[in-house]
């Protein structure tokens, strides 16, 4: 895609027929730590519209309750990274509802996610480790409400574009996600922003030196400049 843009002397936005945004809502990930340190991290990043909390089954009540108190109007995502079993998930349902969690990412081990089939859970569940590319889509529809698309898993924008179109037919919501990596790994997902229900592209926030002309995060927003290093 980037090469075609250069050959045709155009932008990825024009090539794909997508309106280029000037800003997109940013997300910040609070990594798993002692509850007090996690809550301090939350309090230091309240400018972000979305906060994602990496958790396991320990100290959930303290972490979620205090985070919601500090951020009453934020989108809150809980990322269990496969740390729950099905009983953990069910037993904390009331807590998730009370603290108005918007999304729970990969609650169970991917090998155990058949246990989610037919579960009428009150919070949207998102597949991450369970989902890699379009060949997994049919398996997701009866277990999850949302899929996390990462270029590190799909292999590139072409496959990601195929995924979002097929996912919408299956009534699956879309999260645009990332690993800890530079802006070069985020930028090819940006043209899909109109499909996204959640945008979680904070990878460059966790590296010392990002690519030149990469994403800029300002007041919790991603600034989409004209002279980006891709597209």
Question: What kind of region is each of these model predictions?
Answer:
Residues 1-76, 83-87, 94-97, 211-231:
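N-terminal capping/lid subdomain adjacent to the active-site entrance of alpha/beta enzymes
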Residues 29-31, 49-58, 75-82, 99-111, ...:
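Catalytic beta/alpha-barrel core
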Residues 35, 56-72, 84-89, 108-120, ...:
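Active-site-adjacent beta->alpha loops and helix N-cap segments on the catalytic face
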Residues 46-49, 70-74, 94-102, 119-125, ...:
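Glycine-enriched alpha-helix->loop->beta-strand junction motifs that scaffold or abut catalytic
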Residues 71-75, 151-153, 161-177, 220-227:
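P-loop/Walker A phosphate-binding loop and immediately adjacent motor/lid segment at beta-alpha junctions
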């Amino acid at each position: 895609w980037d090469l075609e843009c250069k050959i045709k002397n155009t932008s990825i936005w024009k090539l794909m027929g997508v309106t280029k945004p000037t800003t997109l809502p940013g997300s910040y990930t609070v990594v798993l730590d002692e509850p007090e340190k996690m809550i301090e991290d939350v309090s230091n990043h309240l400018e972000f519209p979305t906060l994602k909390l990496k958790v396991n089954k320990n100290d959930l009540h303290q972490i979620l309750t205090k985070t919601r108190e500090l951020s009453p109007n934020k989108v809150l995502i809980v990322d269990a990274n496969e740390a729950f079993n099905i009983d953990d998930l069910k037993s904390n349902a009331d807590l998730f509802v009370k603290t108005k969690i918007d999304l729970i990412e990969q609650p169970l081990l991917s090998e155990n996610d058949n246990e989610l089939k037919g579960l009428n859970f009150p919070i949207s569940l998102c597949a991450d480790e369970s989902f890699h590319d379009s060949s997994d889509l049919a398996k997701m529809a009866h277990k999850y409400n949302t899929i996390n698309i990462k270029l590190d898993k799909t292999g590139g924008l072409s496959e990601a574009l195929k995924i979002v179109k097929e996912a919408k037919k299956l009534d699956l919501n879309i999260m645009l996600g990332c690993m800890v990596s530079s802006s070069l790994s985020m930028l090819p997902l940006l043209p899909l922003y109109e499909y996204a229900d959640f945008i979680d592209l904070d990878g460059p926030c966790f590296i010392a030196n990002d690519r030149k002309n990469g994403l800029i995060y300002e007041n919790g927003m991603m600034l989409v400049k004209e002279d980006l290093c891709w597209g």
